[in-house]
Amino acid sequence: MLGSPLREYELLVSLGSEFEPEAESRVRSLFTPVEPEGVTVKHLDVLGVRKFAYEIKGRNDGVCVVVRLLANAGSIAEIGRQMRLTEDVIRTKLLRVGRK
């Protein structure tokens, strides 16, 4: 969606716990295809390995990464597609910041 306004989003990404050492670089690589569309990563925070409340895709824990970014709606759709295609990603949650 070219021309749609940039909005701020917060994305929680859970990766397999075996990816803890390279979690930041793996998550950053997911944004490479959409950077030309104006997506800007404002902040990326690796929270470390966390236990899940229930089993997800046969796993009980994973590395949690929180990403704050600016993007338009079309870019967010592409980011979601990239996340679904990446086997390392266990679960994602996307929130629009500042929305009531």
From Swiss-Prot:
Q: Set out the biological process GO terms recorded for this chain's protein.
A: translation
A family per Pfam: Ribosomal_S6
Q: Which GO terms describe its molecular function?
A: rRNA binding; structural constituent of ribosome
Q: Which InterPro entries match?
A: Ribosomal_bS6, Ribosomal_bS6_sf, Ribosomal_S6_plastid/chlpt, Transl_elong_EF1B/ribsomal_bS6
Question: Taxonomically, which superkingdom?
Answer: Bacteria
Record flagged with keyword NADP: no
**GO CC annotation terms, alphabetical:** ribonucleoprotein complex; ribosome
Alphabetically ordered keywords of this record: Ribonucleoprotein, Ribosomal protein, RNA-binding, rRNA-binding
Q: What family does the database annotate? A: Belongs to the bacterial ribosomal protein bS6 family.
Q: What does this protein do?
A: Binds together with bS18 to 16S ribosomal RNA.
Q: Which HAMAP family match?
A: Ribosomal_bS6
Its recorded name reads Small ribosomal subunit protein bS6
